[in-house]
Structure formats: C-alpha cells, structure tokens
C-alpha cells in the first residue's frame, strides 16, 4: 500500500470489540502501514547504526479470547526475533501512537542495562522534555521522562523479574506529526536519532 500517514480510524480500530474482529481490522488497516513505515525506518536505522536491522510485526498469535490492547512493529538486529533484545517499536494503543526504544521482560540483560542507565544519568538527562517512559508495554500508562519516575522505573526494570523499560515519544490521535507520510517519517527519524545513543549503550 501507499502509506499516507496514520489517521483517527487507526486508533478506532483498537476499540473494535472481539478478538477476531479487532485482529481483522489490525491486519487489514494497520499492519500494511506498519510494513510501509517499518521498511523505511529499518533502512534508516541500518544506515545509522552500520548494522543490518530487521523488521518484525506483532502477530498476537498467543491470544485466544481477549483482543490486543496495542499493536506494533519492532526493529531489531536479530532476524529471528526481537523480544529478548533491545529494539525499537512503533505502535498504537487506542489513545496514542508510540515510538519506543523497548526493553521488555524477555530481555536477558536487564540487570546490566538498568545499572548502566542508572550510573550514566546523562544518557537519559539529555532526552527532550516531551519524551516519555513506560514500565510495561501492555499498559497505557506513561510518564514524562523528566517527571521524577525515571529512577524508580529503571530500578523496577532491574529488580523485578517481569520489569520493563520503554523510552521514547507518544502522539495523541490529533497530533499533526502523524500525517502526511513524509511528516511522520521525518518525525520518527528524529525520535530514533535521540534514542540511538541509549540503544548503543545498552549493547555495550
């Protein structure tokens, strides 16, 4: 498909009742956009990082009853899977679109990564004020990155078995960065540029 940007209809897709109906909406309306956006951003990140990156699109295959509250694409250096590695995400809840650098609970280096971020505070202190963090990729709740929740979120990521840490930027459905396509891609690339130093630090 020709990607024209994200619209309010995409957010409404995440409100459709029922697993089968919502998944049909995701597969027909959102995933083609994810593929188009993801291919561009994967190429961009590969060039920026000097390392081949691979696109993954969430399939939600484990779900049998409840529809997913969010859906996303992921970009990672591992072709076989992304969940145990630091990775970039672009995705949707019904209330906002997110662009994250994500460390989810399957990550095998959470202790090392959290301690590095806690020690090297400048890495996160330099992020723009309009960035956000999340302690759980399955929940909509986010916090401004400089709002006093950062240290506690990193400590939880380090100390709790299913702790997570996501950092990036969120966009409400009426945000003018979401369309047209060229504006969204430009915005996403700017966000990724801010997150790349954190990504590199996490891989050290």
Curated annotation (Swiss-Prot):
Pfam families: DUF1054 (PF06335). InterPro entries: UPF0637, UPF0637_domain_sf. It comes from the Bacteria. Belongs to the UPF0637 family. HAMAP family: UPF0637. This is UPF0637 protein lmo1065. It comes from Listeria monocytogenes serovar 1/2a (strain ATCC BAA-679 / EGD-e).
């Amino acid at each position: 498909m020709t990607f024209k940007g994200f619209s309010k209809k995409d957010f409404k897709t995440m409100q459709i009742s029922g697993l089968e109906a919502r998944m049909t909406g995701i597969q027909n309306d959102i995933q083609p956009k994810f593929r188009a956006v993801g291919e561009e951003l994967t190429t961009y990140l590969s060039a920026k990082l000097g390392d081949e990156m691979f696109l993954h699109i969430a399939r939600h295959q484990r779900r049998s009853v409840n529809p997913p509250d969010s859906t996303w694409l992921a970009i990672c250096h591992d072709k076989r899977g992304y969940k145990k590695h630091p990775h970039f995400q672009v995705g949707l809840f019904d209330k906002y679109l997110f662009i994250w650098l994500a460390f989810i609970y399957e990550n095998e280096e959470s202790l090392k990564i959290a301690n590095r971020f806690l020690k090297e505070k400048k890495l996160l202190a330099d992020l723009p004020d309009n960035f956000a963090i999340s302690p759980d990729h399955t929940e909509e709740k986010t916090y401004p990155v400089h709002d006093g929740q950062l240290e506690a979120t990193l400590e939880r990521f380090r100390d709790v078995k299913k702790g997570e840490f996501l950092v990036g930027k969120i966009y409400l459905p009426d945000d003018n960065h979401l369309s047209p396509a060229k504006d969204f891609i430009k915005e996403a690339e700017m966000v990724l540029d801010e997150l790349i130093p954190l990504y590199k630090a996490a891989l050290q």
